[in-house]
Amino acid sequence: MSEKIVVCLEKGGARDMAEAFSRRTNTTISEKPGEHLTVLFNSKGVSLTGYGLAYQGDFENMLHRVTNGRLQHEMLVRASKSEKPGRKAIDATAGMGEDGFLLAAQGYEVTLYEQNPVIAVLLKDALRRAKKHPILKEIAARMKLTEGNSVELMPALLDPVDVIYLDPMFPARQKSSLINKKLQLIQKLEPPCSQETDLFDAAISAKPDRK
């Protein structure tokens, strides 16, 4: 991570998740948020706060993209369309899991790779809450998070996959734009991707049907 973070556990927060994250990142748990980046565990889940911004993963925001016939209009869904039963996909640069969610909504069993521990714990919490949602739970059940570097993990895959999706984070061009506020916050802790070639080579080595 490119910036030091504070781990804050408030009343009602998931202590087991906070303690596991604290061990993973070699940080101590505080009762108060930090001045800059804070991973906050409270009764609402896990969020990233700092610099006057706050972000929490929430797949409910994706509902309008997968209901009322809208899913089939998504470019990713059209590109990965398949009638094969038991199809599997990898989202090698999961981020907050939006693209993996679209693949899972299409029926794929999706493995999400995320190497940044902060983004991974935000995604883990978002999936945990989605699995309790009456509509989202069926989609979320097809999504599995693996924390680690996909460049290192994909060449060791034993089971064949049908789709490998790559969407590395690139520098934001309009850092003052409201649409990039989430990206601004995340880029405080993870710089833009610098492994594009390695990522593509690792995906090729896994021999998917599509990539």
Task: Report the location of each language-model feature.
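S-adenosyl-L-methionine
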Residues: 1-89, 105, 113-163
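Hydrophobic alpha-helical segments and helix pairs
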Residues: 77-119
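Conserved beta-strand segments of alpha/beta enzyme cores
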Residues: 28, 109, 142-144
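Conserved proline-anchored active-site loop of SAM-dependent methyltransferases
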Residues: 89-102, 161-180
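Helix-to-beta-strand junctions that scaffold the AdoMet/dcAdoMet cofactor pocket
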Residues: 207-209
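Mobile active-site "lid"/loop adjacent to the S-adenosyl-L-methionine
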Residues: 168-201
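Short, well-ordered alpha-helices that flank and scaffold nucleotide-derived cofactor binding pockets
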Residues: 101, 105, 125-129, 205
